[in-house]
Amino acid sequence: MTVAARARRESPAALRHLGRSALIGSTAAMAAGLLAGGIGSRIAMSLVAVADPSVTGLLTANDNRVGEMSLGGTLFLAVTATLVSAFHGGVVYIASGRLLPGSTVVRGLLLGAALLCVFGTEIIDATNRDFVRFASPAWDIGLFAGLFVAFGLVASGVGAAMERRLPSADAELGLPFALAGVGLIALWSVIAVLVSADGDPYLIAVFEGAIGVSTLAHVRPSHLASGFACAYLAGISAVGAIGLVRAVVDIVTRDARLS
């Protein structure tokens, strides 16, 4: 059998496996976004009010009131976090899924740590004065950093459950998996292009790199593909961690200067 013929035979199977992984990753990330990102963030703000009752009712930078959990605000935050997480968390989940060792809990902790490094500054923002205004910076940072860990644990648990319950990619339902793979990868590629238009080279590397290593790992599984994925995950985590540490130091030192 020629190389071209073998590639034609293997491509549909690879696409089915990629589609199954994309479906699991997106669903797990959406569930984690709803619970950890949406509901969890509202609980975190309530805990800020518990730590410092004097800030209850004050407006945050996002025009939410500390300690108040309105139905409309909670639903809006839950829906937003769910949709955003389907992409942000989903691509990193799939890119790292075959690399993280250990049990479901350990994998969840590692995924949460990676997401904290990569996307931590999207939440723990040094320019957001709320971290200095409410309670204490250490308490606030700890609460919102914990949301990433909770996200990783929920995503890992949901993903593991789906891995057990969904039919394999080689079963009769392989075609829907293939179609799901085409649709999700196409959607993620469009979103990655939109992110690229924003001009942030780090986010470009995160999203486009995740799509690239995930596709390579399924289409051409090999030690080289795993090596690329490991290098990608280590690289974006290291770069993101540097920015996160800088943000935390800036917030804490700014609080010390204002004291």
Q: Where are the language model's segments positioned?
A:
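Juxtamembrane/disordered regions of integral membrane proteins
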Residues: 2-259
